From Swiss-Prot:
Record's keyword annotation contains Disulfide bond: yes
Amino acids binding a mannooligosaccharide derivative: 130-131, 143, 202, 208, 228, 234
Oligomeric and partner information: Interacts with HRD3.
Record keywords, A-Z: Disulfide bond, Endoplasmic reticulum, Glycoprotein, Lectin, Signal
A single MF term (Gene Ontology): carbohydrate binding
Protein's name in the database: Protein OS-9 homolog
Gene responsible for this protein: OS9
Gene3D superfamilies associated with the record: Mannose-6-phosphate receptor binding domain
Pfam family, one: PRKCSH
Source species taxonomy: Eukaryota, Viridiplantae, Streptophyta, Embryophyta, Tracheophyta
Species of the source: Oryza sativa subsp. japonica
Disulphides: 123-136, 201-232, 216-244
Length: 298
């Protein structure tokens, strides 16, 4: 969607997003008519991040950009969440406090393994005190202790087991998820891969094994936790933004980021607010006034 033809659409998305994101500063976000935007409890949560000139956000290909102005006159180029720009069809301002969003026609979502395929041949790391962990998608999980550049201790916590993973889903019951305080009532919100045949455990004389849980979470892929739930049996949780594209794994209110790059003074001179519809000229709070506040809609 081009800015000329879709400025009203995109800027009203940002307005709704900003009103939802900056809860404490919502009264500082206005249309050019001076009326504030209301918040819709059904909308996703938004987090607005401001980036200085010397450390700009690098947008993805096709990510929609929107010119914005702070209340002290600073100019920014703000980038909408990619998912939002792909799913919003039209936004019609009914009045100064309401926005109606018409969704694109429904498209059958990809299954989890299709979405996670992008992780193939990639490895991710986590450090926890004495131990460091390496998780390789469709590969191995290692637990190591390193001193300098030398590995002092190493255990393999499992290798990807396609057969065991298939059997897990064939035999899955409501009791299949471990009673984990962080995952209660979310048994349908993570996708499991099983890693088996790791280093033999001294306590059980059985190979170590790990259940890898992929959860919907933005903005990047990261190992969020690893726990030993019983002797030499582990649960490793991986935050996976690509999984959020499947509605089954979406939280009730997802958190999406709007990134705003500050413009150089010479670039600011090229921003012509008069070229935009008056109702689309939006004033946002200056980041200095937010004190790095990252607010979310309640």
């Amino acid at each position: 969607m081009g800015l000329a033809g879709g400025a009203r659409v995109v800027l009203f998305v940002v307005a709704a997003a900003a009103a939802a994101a900056l809860t404490a500063a919502a009264d500082q976000i206005f249309t050019s008519s001076g009326a504030p935007f209301g918040r819709n409890s059904r909308e996703p949560r938004y987090h607005v991040e401001f980036h200085p000139v010397d450390a700009p956000f690098n947008p993805e290909n096709g990510q929609e950009s929107v010119p914005m102005t702070s209340h002290v006159g600073k100019h920014y180029t703000c980038f909408l969440p990619v998912e939002e720009t792909k799913t919003m069809k039209s936004i019609i301002p009914q009045n100064a406090t309401n926005v109606i969003i018409e969704s694109e026609r429904r498209v059958k979502p990809k299954d989890p393994d299709e979405l996670l395929e992008i992780l193939k041949d990639q490895c991710f790391y986590r450090h926890e005190g004495w131990w460091s962990y390496e998780f390789c998608y469709y590969g191995k999980i290692r637990q190591v202790h390193v001193e300098g550049e030398k590995v002092i201790q190493e255990y393999v916590l499992g290798e990807y087991d396609a057969d065991a993973t298939d059997a897990y889903y064939e035999n899955q019951t409501s009791d299949s998820a471990d009673e984990d305080d962080n995952l209660i009532d979310t048994s349908k919100r993570y996708h499991v891969h099983l890693y088996t045949n790791g280093t033999v455990c001294d306590l059980t004389d059985m190979p170590r094994e790990t259940e890898v849980r992929f959860v919907c979470s933005e903005p990047t892929v990261v190992i969020s936790s690893i726990k030993e739930i019983s002797s030499c049996k582990y649960v490793l949780t991986v935050q996976s933004p690509m999984l959020c594209k499947n509605p089954l794994f979406q939280q009730e209110k997802r958190t999406l980021s709007i990134h705003c790059n500050e413009l150089l003074a010479e670039a600011e001179a090229t921003v012509d607010d008069d070229s935009l519809p008056k109702e689309a000229q939006i004033i946002i709070p200056d980041p200095d006034g937010l004190h790095n506040y990252a607010a979310y809609a309640t």
